[in-house]
UniProtKB/Swiss-Prot annotation:
This is Veswaprin-b. It comes from Demansia vestigiata (Lesser black whip snake). GO terms for molecular function: serine-type endopeptidase inhibitor activity. Pfam families: WAP. Keywords: Antibiotic, Antimicrobial, Disulfide bond, Secreted, Signal. It comes from the Eukaryota. Expressed by the venom gland. Residues 1-24 form the signal peptide. GO terms for cellular component: extracellular region; extracellular space.
Length: 75
């Protein structure tokens, strides 16, 4: 190996040895506690299918919420 390559290798090894561990073991803990988990709205199941909705409304799913909504007509 040439002296330039050896010097480069030595420099890279020096930089690697100086890096902080990725795990963050040397970092101090942040003060305080985590706040309580935010309340999510309860899952509401107003309908199971379109036929359980009044008139022309359709049963629409938004996450865990099922509700009857007026349909949209596209031309």
């Amino acid at each position: 190996m040439s002296s330039g390559g050896l010097l480069l290798l030595l420099g890279l090894l020096t930089l690697w040895a100086e890096l902080t561990p990725i795990s963050g073991q040397d970092r101090p803990k942040k003060p305080g506690l985590r706040p309580p988990r935010p309340q999510k709205p309860p899952c509401v199941r107003e309908c199971k299918n379109d036929w359980r909705c009044p008139g022309e409304q359709k049963c629409c799913r938004y996450g865990c919420i099922y509700e009857c909504r007026d349909p949209i007509f596209v031309k």
